[in-house]
Amino acid sequence: MPELPEVEVTRQGITPYLVDQTVVDLIVRNPSLRWPVPELAKQIIGQTIRQVRRRAKYLLIDTDAGTSIVHLGMSGSLRILPHDTPVEKHDHIDLVLANGRILRFNDPRRFGAWLWCQLPEEAHPLLEKLGPEPLTDAFNVNQLAASLAGKKKAIKLCLMDNHIVVGVGNIYANEALFAAGIHPEAEAGKIDIERLTVLVAEVKQILAHAIKQGGTTLKDFTNADGKPGYFAQKLHVYGRGGETCTQCGNLLSEIRLGQRTTVFCSICQPR
């Protein structure tokens, strides 16, 4: 599943091709995504795209009339292509631009979404209760400590809770907890401020580095130019259950936590 770095890399890739461009057509081949695609054509055709933003794992394509909210789901991607590029299987939506290019939404598993809202989009039900962005000052040790106070849930589940902090999915939660030396099943409310300080710093560093590397490519993600990300080459624990720890040589443990695969080192991340 594309996580925050992959969505941010996509945003950076498509923005130069979209901003200040007029939408001349919208082609919806399959409206049956995670939620039905609304009747977008009458709202967006003729509109000029003002900016492309990201909130959590949502891409926000702004026009004067409103905002398209795009979510890549489990396997979705957005590509900038020439307008005459042949349509392939799972190419569900084309946003056709006056510059002769299209923004094409491909989603094999159809868990993605393309929605529309009038401004202010912050009041949209998908966005209004989201926590702080991890790469901003709003995500800090004081905020995290307050959010975790009294919680008995495993820290990994809290780290992946979008009400606490957005965009930290399974890949980066595994990696950040390993880097901070925190066991993924540790009771969130009992982690001391010193370790939370380290965890906040590691979340920020790992996400920023993943963005710089173009995201993590496992089996689904490519960026807006169709190129893979390279952060997968630097993963220390995610997807490496049963292999040796890069720090101590111990065999990495793999468990299921919150229905997600969780990998950790029992030596470097003591309970």
Swiss-Prot record:
It comes from the Bacteria. It catalyses: Hydrolysis of DNA containing ring-opened 7-methylguanine residues, releasing 2,6-diamino-4-hydroxy-5-(N-methyl)formamidopyrimidine; 2'-deoxyribonucleotide-(2'-deoxyribose 5'-phosphate)-2'-deoxyribonucleotide-DNA = a 3'-end 2'-deoxyribonucleotide-(2,3-dehydro-2,3-deoxyribose 5'-phosphate)-DNA + a 5'-end 5'-phospho-2'-deoxyribonucleoside-DNA + H(+). InterPro entries: DNA_glyclase/AP_lyase_DNA-bd, DNA_glyclase_Znf_dom_DNA_BS, Formamido-pyr_DNA_Glyclase, FPG_cat, MutM-like_N-ter, Ribosomal_uS13-like_H2TH, Znf_DNA_glyclase/AP_lyase, Znf_FPG/IleRS. The active site is at residues 2-3, 57, 260. Binds 1 zinc ion per subunit. A zinc finger (FPG-type) spans 236-270. Its cofactor is Zn(2+). The keyword Glycoprotein does not apply. It holds the Pfam family zf-FPG_IleRS. Keywords: DNA damage, DNA repair, DNA-binding, Glycosidase, Hydrolase, Lyase, Metal-binding, Multifunctional enzyme, Zinc, Zinc-finger. DNA binds at residues 90, 109, 151. The keyword Zinc-finger applies. One of its GO terms (biological process) is base-excision repair. Its EC number is 3.2.2.23, 4.2.99.18. GO terms for molecular function: 8-oxo-7,8-dihydroguanine DNA N-glycosylase activity; class I DNA-(apurinic or apyrimidinic site) endonuclease activity; damaged DNA binding; DNA-(apurinic or apyrimidinic site) endonuclease activity; zinc ion binding. Monomer. Belongs to the FPG family. PANTHER family: FORMAMIDOPYRIMIDINE-DNA GLYCOSYLASE. HAMAP family: Fapy_DNA_glycosyl. Involved in base excision repair of DNA damaged by oxidation or by mutagenic agents. Acts as a DNA glycosylase that recognizes and removes damaged bases. Has a preference for oxidized purines, such as 7,8-dihydro-8-oxoguanine (8-oxoG). Has AP (apurinic/apyrimidinic) lyase activity and introduces nicks in the DNA strand. Cleaves the DNA backbone by beta-delta elimination to generate a single-strand break at the site of the removed base with both 3'- and 5'-phosphates. This is Formamidopyrimidine-DNA glycosylase. It comes from Shewanella oneidensis (strain ATCC 700550 / JCM 31522 / CIP 106686 / LMG 19005 / NCIMB 14063 / MR-1).
